[in-house]
Amino acid sequence: MSEEKIVNTEAAPEAVAERPARAERSERPERPAKGPFGKKRFESRRKVCKLCAEKIENVDYKNFQFIKSFTMDSGKILSRRITGTCAKHQRQIASAVKRDRNLAILPYSLPKK
């Protein structure tokens, strides 16, 4: 014995009430140029990739003084957000740092003092 659900397809469509129009939003006042303590707000400049600016196509692992400028004192690689390099050159810098570490030109990490 199978139970079948009977669906009433001839139900009368209910009257759909229209929604009232949305109230107009008031415009926000413009923010002042000064911060909360009266100081001027800090606007950071957009960082530009050094390598793109100097039109360097490939990062050379032999130029370890240049590559060392993209690492912290502890030996970690600095992020793109800090250095301002583009994605292409950040990948090249990372591989050059890893190659220099492998060749013992750069340290993996410096001991804590």
Curated annotation (Swiss-Prot):
GO terms for cellular component: cytosolic small ribosomal subunit. The gene is rpsR. NCBIfam families: S18. Residues 16-33 have a biased composition (Basic and acidic residues). Belongs to the bacterial ribosomal protein bS18 family. The keyword Transport does not apply. One of its GO terms (biological process) is translation. The keyword Cytoplasm does not apply. It holds the Pfam family Ribosomal_S18. It comes from Elusimicrobium minutum (strain Pei191). GO terms for molecular function: small ribosomal subunit rRNA binding; structural constituent of ribosome. SUPFAM superfamilies: Ribosomal protein S18. Keywords: Ribonucleoprotein, Ribosomal protein, RNA-binding, rRNA-binding. This is Small ribosomal subunit protein bS18. Part of the 30S ribosomal subunit. Forms a tight heterodimer with protein bS6. Binds as a heterodimer with protein bS6 to the central domain of the 16S rRNA, where it helps stabilize the platform of the 30S subunit. Residues 1-41 are annotated as: Disordered.
